[in-house]
């Protein structure tokens, strides 16, 4: 597999997983050898993917990444909220509407791909951005996207993201997928919300109840 192709594979290889490889067979004339030029790698079946996730979950749990005692406390009245999500689509619109209706608060949006090959890097950079931001820093970060297939949500199960969330100095709320979707991002975050709209309701008070 050529180095230039690796970033486009959308998969992190680990010992024990089964994959399907697509490519083309060529000959290496100087040594009379055949070689397979890898162009695409995908997981072989959802069952294999679930097995991989369960193994990863157990290993990270044993290392303490999901311990409740290590969760950071979220302010009851956050002055500003950082949002890592797609800058277009229903999710960000729902969040803005819910914040406006519930308890108007300053929002800082970090545009991110929430699916595909750029998703993981974008979200990690978003977390880093809010953590090093000195001016107008935020009190809490929401990572949000709508529902999707198991493969669509795989970036939110990556070990690199788990470690980045764990090390964040700012509390993080995971609002990934629908109510039945669970990711490793949910387990390591300081709070898990079943939906992006629910995340707002969980961290912001209702002004109608306060007045």
What are these regions (language model features)?
Residues 3, 38-40, 188:
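A short beta-strand motif that forms part of the nucleic acid-binding face
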Residues 1-12:
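Beta-strand/loop nucleic-acid-binding surfaces
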Residues 10, 37-103:
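Extended, charge-rich, solvent-exposed interface segments
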Residues 14-27:
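OB-fold and OB-like beta-barrel modules that bind single-stranded nucleic acids
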Residues 1, 20-22, 35-37:
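Short, conserved beta-strand segments within well-ordered enzyme catalytic domains
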Residues 27-36:
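Short, Lys/Arg- and Gly-enriched loop/turn segments at beta-strand edges
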